[in-house]
Amino acid sequence: MRYLLQRILFYAFTAWAAITINFFIPRMIPGDPVKSLLARYQGQMSTDAIDSLYVLFGLDKDASVWSQYVDYWQQLLRGDLGLSFTAFPATVSEVISDALPWTVALVGITTIISFVLGTGLGVLAGWRRGSWIDGLLPTTTFLSSVPYFWLGLLAIYLLAGPGSFFPSSGGFEPGLVPAWDQYFIPSAVQHSLLPALTILVSSVSGWILSMRNMMVTVAAEDYITVAHAKGLPERRVAVGYAARNALLPNVSGFALALGFIVGGTLLVEIVFSYPGLGFLLFRAVGAKDYPLMQGIFLVITISVLLANLIADVAYLLLDPRTRKEG
């Protein structure tokens, strides 16, 4: 329990540091976002109205940085991430909530499939060395070394195009309204196939290799030999003894992969113009939408920290040594 408490305190400090950095970085970037907003909409406003916009966006020139920092924390604790410059007067929370489900659906499901498939193949490859799975390792290793975006471009070139089943961009057919109906869901699934295939091909080999190497190491341990000597079934030894202990490093990696779901496939979403959080961040950076950038970075930070905490809890459950040390 003490171990878990230490980890929670560490993550709390890390979250505070990340949020503090998230507050200061946009204020260090050259440019005036309010003037950019006025120029974009070609607005003519009085001086008092412009000053009100600065206050509205938390950039009051008459307030000290410390005062702005305190106000920023008060807004966060209320769940208020501010107003988006590019989607004004929509709030950052509303803009992120529109894009987040797309990323979670695409990358989340693909990451889980990749982990389950790669771990299962890794167990077989490590337990039955020299099988047909070993023959796949050079190819999968090569594909894992290829950047996401390059595989995406290659997939578009080879599989997408006029008359093809695979759309080359977007999240659904133009003219459809996002809804849980028989028209939108098939279209959304169809548009997600190529991005999902790109992520799956790039990531699955990492799980295969790491699990295979751990299985080879664990298979040489004395307790595996003892289990065989006791006459235990092969399946029970492989799954209950070898795979369970070999799985621990992959659990940590899987938790981190879940944490990076919301921001780990930026380039894939850009290549396919997929309406997820990564593509939203790309547009926010181009438009210097600082509140939106801060909101997205905050979501990514919290996601990664929560994923690490989940990994620590999983370690406590899977590894008795951790509980004894705590």
Task: Give the predicted meaning of each segment.
Residues 2-3, 96, 100-133, 148, ...:
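Alpha-helical transmembrane segments of integral membrane proteins
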Residues 5-11:
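N-terminal signal-anchor/signal peptide hydrophobic helix marking the start
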Residues 11, 43-44, 115, 141, ...:
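Residue-level recognition of pore/gate-forming positions within transmembrane alpha-helices
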Residues 13-21, 65, 69, 108-112, ...:
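Hydrophobic alpha-helical transmembrane segments of multi-pass integral membrane proteins
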Residues 15-68, 163-184:
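Hydrophobic alpha-helical transmembrane segments of membrane transport/permease proteins
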Residues 21-30, 71-74, 139-170, 198-200, ...:
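Membrane-water interface segments at the C-terminal ends of transmembrane alpha-helices
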Residues 48, 52, 64, 68-72, ...:
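Generic alpha-helical secondary structure signal
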Residues 60-119:
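An internal, D/E-rich "acidic patch" concept
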